[in-house]
Amino acid sequence: MSHDDPTVTDPTLYKVIFENERVRVLEYRDEPGDRTHPHQHPDSVMVTLSAFRRRITVDDRSAEVELHAGEARWIGAQAHTGQNIGDTATYSVFVELKEPRPAPVPAGDPPLGPSRS
């Protein structure tokens, strides 16, 4: 595990619930006001098990995200920090892909946090 792995940077927030040679599945839980340390995710699918609001920050850019329970979103590989800026706990599952991206990454700044595609 690398030093920027979320289970290393924030072991009280991230927990591995399944892993094999192709994917790793993380459970994430936090409370209002909680912040993560800088960490890295590979390409992933996030499934929200609770509604939440959070701020995602990458370098000098940040975005506020509000999601409902039961949503599934793609998250391209990125290093970031996150903060629960809402008034509810966050509960989500990340399915991290271990296989390399099949196509080149599009030019420009990648989206922050989860996207619909």
Question: Locations of the language-model features?
Answer:
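Extracytoplasmic/periplasmic copper-protein system
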Residues: A103-S117
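Local beta-strand/beta-hairpin segments that build beta-sheet-rich folds
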Residues: V8, L13-F18, P102-A103
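Conserved short histidine dyad/triad with adjacent acidic residue
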Residues: R24-Q40, T57-D59, G76
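Ligand-binding loop in jelly-roll beta-barrel domains
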Residues: A51, A77-P100
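Short acidic-glycine-tyrosine-enriched beta hairpin
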Residues: E21, D60-Q78
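Short, conserved beta-strand element in jelly-roll/cupin
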Residues: Q40-R55
